[in-house]
Amino acid sequence: MAKRNSRNTRGRIISAAWKLFYEQGYDGTTVEDIVFESGTSKGSFYHYFDGKDALMGTLAYVFDEKYEDLMPTLDPEKGAIETLAYINHELYVMIESSVSIDLLTRLLSTQLLARGEKHLLDRSRVYFRLLKKIVRQGAERGEFRPGLAQEEIVRAFAMWERAQLYDWCLCGGDYLSLIHI
């Protein structure tokens, strides 16, 4: 139970932070704002994060929350390609409506410069578990070329999505809503 509560507290802090970053901008958001919005304490904030900058690596957590929300809506009768297209589209709709291009650019640059953990590549994320499940089901139905490794399909799809995000940032956010598989 304590682990679940700590995950909820950390999650509330992350969700509140990204909401405020989008509404007020990163520089316009203070730790006090985040603590107030999350309904937590400064002690809780600093228990999980060294400071506001530490939240930059948590966007993958926000993305994973979106994937968790999408899981019950996935139609098991749809093919893998259609399901991948759906989750891709839904994530990008969420990004356009709640993640500023400046923040996404910062996240991608911190991931490029990170010497330690690269959150976007963490194979234990909900994202990768969901991709593996979709690809496995597609392979079982014969939707992919025989001999094509499921892990390679997952890796290629994840790489393609990161490339889209990077290119969207490079282009100033002009076209994300036009991207569909």
Give the positions of each predicted feature.
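Basic, helix-initiating cap at the start of DNA-binding domains
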Residues: 1-24, 28-40, 53-54
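Short, charged helix-capping/linker segments at alpha-helix termini
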Residues: 27-28, 144, 148
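Short hydrophobic/aromatic patch on the recognition helix
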Residues: 39-49
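Alpha-helical DNA-contacting segments of helix-turn-helix folds
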Residues: 49, 56-63
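Hydrophobic alpha-helical connector segments
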Residues: 58, 72-99, 150-157
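Short secondary-structure transition hinges
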Residues: 93-132, 143, 152
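Amphipathic C-terminal alpha-helical segment
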Residues: 93-97, 133, 137, 154-176
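Conserved small/polar residues in nucleotide/adenosyl-binding loops
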Residues: 179-181
